Regions:
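Outer-envelope exported proteins of Gram-negative bacteria
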Residues: 112-116, 151, 161-169, 215-221, ...
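Cleavable N-terminal export/targeting peptides
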Residues: 1-36
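Outer-membrane beta-barrel translocator domains and adjoining extracellular loop/strand segments
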Residues: 52-58, 75, 81-92, 123-132, ...
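Repeated loop/turn-to-beta-strand initiation elements of outer-membrane beta-barrel proteins
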Residues: 68-73, 108-113, 160, 211-214, ...
C-alpha cells in the first residue's frame, strides 16, 4: 500500500494550491483493469486575515499520473476580498494564476516541484469606495513562483503514515499603493515584492473505512521568509495568500498548523476539507478554510 499522503493532506490552493502534491491514491492502488490515470479536482474557500478581512479563492486542477510520477496543471483565482482595517494606501487586487507541477517517488522519497505565472488586477473602484478618493492607475501587476519540496513517507502500520518534508520557494508579486495628490485625488504606484521562503515540517495521515477510502490528517510546519508579502502560498496547505494585505513585506518566521479530512464517496469520487492557520506571523494572522471534490478516471 502507498497511501498518497500529500494528495489528501494538501487538499485545498494554493493556493495551491491548489489540491494535491502527489498522485491520487485511487490511481496507484487500483487494479490494472481499473487503473485511473487522470484526475480533476475543484476547490474553493477563503483565507481570513485577523482584523483585515478575507480573500476568497477557487481553483481547478487536472492531473495525469505515470506510475509513481505525475504532472499537474492548476488554474487559481484569488479575489481581492474585503480589506477592513487595511491601510488607506492599500489598493486591493485580484489574482489569476496558472501552476504547472510535477513530482515522482523514489522508494519512500517524494520529489515535487512547480512553476506558477499569474496576473493581478488592481481594483481602483474598491479603493475609491473605501477612501472616497479617485485614483489614477493604468497598469496591472503580475505574479511568479517556483518551488521544490522533498517528502519522506514513514509507514505507521497498515493505515497511517508520517511524512516529514522540507521545501523552498521563490516568489515575486506586484503590489500597488496610493500616493496622495492635491485636490483629494491619488496616484497609484506599482512595485514588486520578491523573496525566498523555506519550510520544514511534517504531516500525518490516518486511513479508515471501506478500502481505506476515508482519511483524517494533521499538518505542522515552521517557515522562514525573506519577504512575507512575496510568499504566494501556492501550496494549498499554506494559509498565507497572494500579497498579504497588498503591502510591502519584511523578513519573517512563523508556524503553520492545520487538519484535513477526506471522504471517499466511491473509487472515483472524494470530498476534501482542509483548515490551516498561521501563528507568529508579523502581519495579520491567517486562517485558510478549503473544501473540494476530486474525480479520477
Amino acid at each position: 500500500m502507498r497511501p498518497i499522503f500529500i494528495a489528501r493532506l494538501a487538499a485545498t490552493i494554493a493556493i495551491s494550491a491548489v489540491i494535491a502534491a502527489a498522485a491520487p491514491a485511487a490511481a496507484q492502488d487500483a487494479p490494472a483493469t481499473d487503473k485511473r490515470d487522470w484526475s480533476i479536482t475543484a476547490t474553493g474557500g477563503s483565507t481570513i486575515f485577523a482584523g483585515t478581512g478575507d480573500q476568497p479563492f477557487a481553483s481547478v486542477g487536472v492531473t495525469r499520473n505515470f506510475g509513481d510520477s505525475y504532472v499537474r496543471l492548476t488554474g487559481t483565482y484569488v479575489d481581492g476580498g474585503s480589506d477592513d482595517g487595511a491601510p488607506l494606501s492599500t489598493i486591493p487586487a485580484s489574482t489569476r494564476q496558472m501552476t504547472l507541477g510535477a513530482g515522482t517517488y523514489v522508494g519512500a522519497l517524494g520529489v515535487d516541484g512547480y512553476v506558477s505565472l499569474g496576473d493581478r488586477r488592481f481594483d481602483r473602484r474598491a479603493f475609491t469606495t473605501r477612501t472616497g478618493q479617485t485614483i489614477a492607475l493604468d497598469s496591472n501587476g503580475a505574479s511568479f513562483g517556483a518551488g521544490l519540496s522533498l517528502t519522506y513517507e514513514i509507514p505507521l502500520g497498515d493505515s497511517a503514515v508520517l511524512a516529514p518534508f522540507v521545501a523552498g520557494d521563490y516568489s515575486r508579486i506586484s503590489i500597488a499603493r496610493a500616493l496622495a495628490l492635491p485636490g483629494g485625488t491619488s496616484m497609484g504606484e506599482e512595485s514588486r515584492e520578491d523573496g525566498i521562503t523555506g519550510s520544514l515540517g511534517a504531516s500525518a495521515l490516518w486511513l479508515f473505512g471501506p478500502d481505506q477510502r476515508h482519511s483524517v490528517g494533521l499538518y505542522a510546519a515552521a517557515l522562514t521568509s525573506s519577504n512575507n508579502s512575496a510568499y504566494n502560498g501556492t501550496n494549498a496547505t499554506r494559509a498565507t495568500a497572494l500579497g498579504i494585505g497588498d503591502q510591502p513585506g519584511v523578513s519573517d518566521e512563523w508556524i503553520e498548523y492545520g487538519a484535513t479530512a477526506a471522504l471517499g464517496l466511491s473509487a472515483a469520487v472524494d470530498l476534501q476539507l482542509a483548515v490551516v492557520r498561521t501563528a507568529g506571523f508579523l502581519g495579520p494572522e491567517a486562517t485558510s478554510v478549503t473544501a473540494g471534490v476530486g474525480f479520477s478516471f
